[in-house]
Amino acid sequence: RWIAPHPGRPHERPFYFDTGPSLITLPFVFEETFAAAGRKLSDYLTLTRLDPIQKYIWADGTTLSGRAMPADLAAELARFTQQPDEVAAFQRILAKGKMIWDESAELFLYHAPEQVLKGDGKFDPRRALSMLTIPIKIGMFANFAKWINREVSHPRLREVLYQYATYSGASPFMAPATLLVIPFAEYHFGGWYIPGGLYSLA
């Protein structure tokens, strides 16, 4: 019944539910895909930037909003944790994610491995040797939860960060620290929504 393999949209009239991705974090990927086909994304879809990107609610009524702007996010984290050190810790996690992005995006996002090996595309093959150290730099052999726990002590803020591993179906206690790139990408590039739900993209 559904066109796309991952996003689904079951419904209980009159409500529809996205069962796959709930937001877009790299809108430029879709813009470039449409451009490669000679089309403009904006002619087909309207992307709306979310603020907050998400809202966390605990059983006791405690809430945390993932605000889109850095200053607003810092203020919300300060309110939530009541600990300035925890705000700084969260920012260090995002900085780690940025480092992972900077080190790996060119190789893993912008170029397929076979392009690198064949010298295709814009990738500079002279950088290939230096990239042998990338797996260590980006935390491929480090543990996601342990890295978070080393920086963050607030138990619920840890929970918030743990759930980024579950985006890919992984356990935060078994996943590599490389997945810290996910919260960075979400807050740096923003969370975006398509009116009507992400199934509209399919």
Where are these regions (language model features)?
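N-terminal FAD cofactor-binding segment of flavoenzymes
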Residues: 7-53
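Short, glycine/acidic-rich beta->alpha junctions
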Residues: 26, 140, 197-201
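Rossmann-like flavin
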Residues: 56-176
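A short glycine/serine-rich beta->alpha loop
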Residues: 12-16, 167-169, 190-192
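N-terminal Rossmann-like FAD-binding beta1-loop-alpha1 element of flavoenzymes
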Residues: 1
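Helical element adjacent to the flavin cofactor pocket in flavoenzyme catalytic cores
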Residues: 181-202
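Acidic surface patches and DE-rich sequence motifs
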Residues: 4, 11, 58
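Active-site substrate-recognition segment that forms the wall
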Residues: 43, 172-177, 181
